[in-house]
Structure formats: C-alpha cells, structure tokens
Amino acid sequence: MKVAAAFLLAVLGGNANPSADNIKDIIGAVGADVDGESIELLLKEVSGKDIAELIASGREKLASVPSGGGVAVSAAPSSGGGGAAAPAEKKEAKKEEKEESDDDMGFSLFE
C-alpha cells in the first residue's frame, strides 16, 4: 500500500512517470523501509495506463466487494429486548456531557 501511495504522490506532484528511485525517495523520506521487488511489480502493472482510469477501476472493484455491514443488520433483529437498551445509552451520554462541561477549572483560554 505504501508503494502505491508513494507512486500516486509522485504523480500528483507532477511526475507523470515516476521511477523506482523516485518511489524509494518518497518512502525513505518518512523513514519507512521498502523492497525493490514490490516497486518493480507496481511499475510493471501501471506502465502505460492512465492513473484516473486505474482509480476508477479500483473504485468499481471495491464497490463490488461485500462489506461487513450485512452481519450487523441480521444480528440486530434477533434480540427481542433490544429496544429497551437504547434509551439507557442515551441517558448515559447526557450524563457524560454534563460531567465534561463542569470541568471549567476557573479559567478561560480566551481571556
């Protein structure tokens, strides 16, 4: 992922065809390690392709992947007494807000 991010940073920075050394420099600037094999693989896969098309293709693929949201939805209706728990949580949240607002300590940052 860091190799792809460094590649995109180079492209967004104006380098239409970043080299392996450019990507190594970007990753090295943040103190991360990188292996040359993953850089070469990425450069081979994206050579001659438009970055905007690659991003659009990736979005389509991610949209087709099922997310974990379906599991939570099917689990929620199975509990019969689930409706009573929700108001208790709201009351606790209100109490916490009051406690936080009482932490004035007698001074203001803007005075």
Curated annotation (Swiss-Prot):
Coiled coil, from the record: none
Keywords: Phosphoprotein, Ribonucleoprotein, Ribosomal protein
Entry keyword Zinc: no
Disulfide bond annotation, renumbered to this chain: none
Annotated segments matching region Disordered: 63-111
Protein task: Plays an important role in the elongation step of protein synthesis.
Family: Belongs to the eukaryotic ribosomal protein P1/P2 family.
Protein name, as recorded: Large ribosomal subunit protein P2w
